[in-house]
Amino acid sequence: MALHFERIGFAPELVNYRECLDLQRQVHQEVVAGSRGNTVLMVEHDPVYTAGRRTEKHEYPWDGTEVVPIGRGGKLTYHGPGMLVGYPIVRLPIPLDVVRFVRVLEEVIIAVVRDFGVPATTVEGRSGAWVLADERGPDRKISAIGVQVSKRATMHGFALNCSNDLRPFGKIIPCGITDAGVTSLSAETGNRIDPADVVERMEQELSAREADLCVPFEPDTPAEPVRLPAPGTATSAAAS
């Protein structure tokens, strides 16, 4: 079965992070159970900081802004308007190779970013997609990746800076990296490039790499459409 994409919400209808986290968990349970095929949620979030498992308290925002602790790898990062966030919830092959999964995501993102005229690449020892140091400044991260694997299926995923305000990153040490900066497609090209301009191309590239990302399978029964929980009903606690 082909990789299935669900566009959950884009500006002006931004998606609350906790509500989307509940949705991720629901879809993850269904993929594990075999009642839903491999699915990628595409979304643009309200402003939020999230902390991966390796985040330490002293790395939290200096102004006391709320942080949502989550189970992905990595450290502290920011999501907000103008950022394309993708959550691949897919079954991995056995034996599990999470590093390989992350490498394929990097390759997908880099291919998409280059299509928009930005020479992204990888940096040894650091995950995500990067623009290397030049006359404009040091190495700059344009996309972050952080995943979690449970019962052979993935959660969380990637965030690509498209047209988002980069100033919220100034309140934290993004991903725990002190000697590099952050950037976006819009900042690098000088043209406004929104998530809605990128999402179709991202879906195409993910589909082209499906065999490298996951094990295709047919769900036991046709799955219901993915829906966010009703506003105000999110159950994800701060320690999620």
UniProtKB/Swiss-Prot annotation:
GO molecular function: lipoyl(octanoyl) transferase activity
CDD domains given in the database record: LipB
Residues with site note (Lowers pKa of active site Cys): 141
Pfam families: LplA-B_cat
Known catalytic reactions: octanoyl-[ACP] + L-lysyl-[protein] = N(6)-octanoyl-L-lysyl-[protein] + holo-[ACP] + H(+)
Residue ranges annotated for the BPL/LPL catalytic domain, each copy included: 34-214
Keyword Zinc: no
Region (Disordered): 217-240
UniProt cross-references to InterPro entries, sorted A to Z: aa-tRNA-synth_II/BPL/LPL, BPL_LPL_catalytic, Octanoyltransferase
Subcellular localization: Cytoplasm
Ranges annotated as biased composition (Low complexity): 229-240
GO cellular component, one term: cytoplasm
Pathway: Protein modification; protein lipoylation via endogenous pathway; protein N(6)-(lipoyl)lysine from octanoyl-[acyl-carrier-protein]: step 1/2
Amino acids binding substrate: 72-79, 144-146, 157-159
Keywords from the named record: Acyltransferase, Cytoplasm, Transferase
Active-site residues, Swiss-Prot/TrEMBL: 175
General function of this protein: Catalyzes the transfer of endogenously produced octanoic acid from octanoyl-acyl-carrier-protein onto the lipoyl domains of lipoate-dependent enzymes. Lipoyl-ACP can also act as a substrate although octanoyl-ACP is likely to be the physiological substrate.
Misc note: In the reaction, the free carboxyl group of octanoic acid is attached via an amide linkage to the epsilon-amino group of a specific lysine residue of lipoyl domains of lipoate-dependent enzymes.
Family stated for the protein in its record: Belongs to the LipB family.
Protein name: Octanoyltransferase
Originating organism: Kocuria rhizophila (strain ATCC 9341 / DSM 348 / NBRC 103217 / DC2201)
